[in-house]
Amino acid sequence: YTGFEDLNMQTYIVVSAEVLSRYVFRSDVAYDWNISMDELNEDTRKFKEDHLNTFSRKNDRLDWSYYPQEPSANDSENRNAYLHELGKITNRSRFVDGLNVDAPYTTTAHYWLIKQMVNADEWRMISDDDFSIRNAFYRVFTKELRLSDAHHFICQVNKTKSRKQCLKEFGQAKAELLDWGDIRGFKTKFLRTLASHYLTELLTSHQFHEEAISKDGERYRKYADNPIKHPLATKDKGFYSVDCRTDLSALEPNEIAKMLLNVNDHSTNSFIQQIRRYISSLERPLTTARGDKKSYIYANFNPKYAQFAITILRTYYNFCRPFKSADKKVLTPAQRLGITDKQFDWKDIIYFK
């Protein structure tokens, strides 16, 4: 389909994992393979979806929330615009069954299902500063956020850095932290311990929220958009910034420092890397040898089976694939989380051993 990629049919995958054990709770493809164009057309005719605001549409979760209808005498839409929209959706219907789902809708459902699955009194959420993620998290965990039982940390990474620059920043961060420890009189050379002391000292004066006064003269605290540089740079990302969008004023600096030390995106990045490595059908389109066109030889033409493949990989990743962590232990994510005390293999999963 020449020019079809210009329709921006990106299919998103929403992944959530536990930061310490790297256990992946869910991995959901933002796609509805059960919906058909006939159903969309029927809903549009029945509920007049093409004349409603987006928030009132039954199928607003889909990238095509209504099916184009021929304009009546009282419609403001002209026939040329109708034919243009009809041509686009007709071309889309010939491509693959089903329709893409908006990422915010999938993310909201994703978090809701995790909330039902995980029995927890307090929640600590780490993400980049993406509006759809923030909106979904705040909708699902409204009560917990209001009671300060949930906090949202932001991890921002500059992905334009070169590998060389990241390695340079990693060495720089290590040297700066050791120098700071010597100046403060700490005998330990353990970087994580020094980073904890550094953050505790910094947070005695640094605030992620600030006081403001409303029009009625009432004082309240608001997000200050005041991130800090994480003292522990990494080899693949270099320096990165951390922030918190929820109010932490009720906590002591050492408690906040302990949480900030764990703010990173390693757990989700690790699983996404496995998806790219083991499920070739989810790779991005490749540039052809001539460099002027795209080759979709590995493109994903069936999101339904992509979801199946990701779920199988997630099970293998959680229960069968061990990794070595800083504590020198080689365990699977499920073992680290305490779900099981053994490492499984494919036969255990296939035959339910």
Where are the language model's segments positioned?
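Intrinsically disordered, low-complexity acidic Ser/Thr-rich regulatory segments
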Residues: W64-N119, E211-N264, K293, I297-Y298
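Inter-helix linker motif
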Residues: L145-K168, Q172
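RNase H-like nuclease fold core
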Residues: Y1-A120
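Acidic/histidine-rich, metal-coordinating catalytic segments
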Residues: Y111-F137
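A short acidic (Asp/Glu
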Residues: F4-E5, D38, I133-F141
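Short, conserved catalytic/metal-binding motifs centered on acidic residues
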Residues: Y1-T2, R22, M125-D128, N269, ...
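C-terminal domain-tail junction helix/linker
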Residues: K215-R219, Y223-P227, T234, V242-D243, ...
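Short amphipathic alpha-helical "interface-anchor" segments enriched in bulky aromatics
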Residues: V263-K294
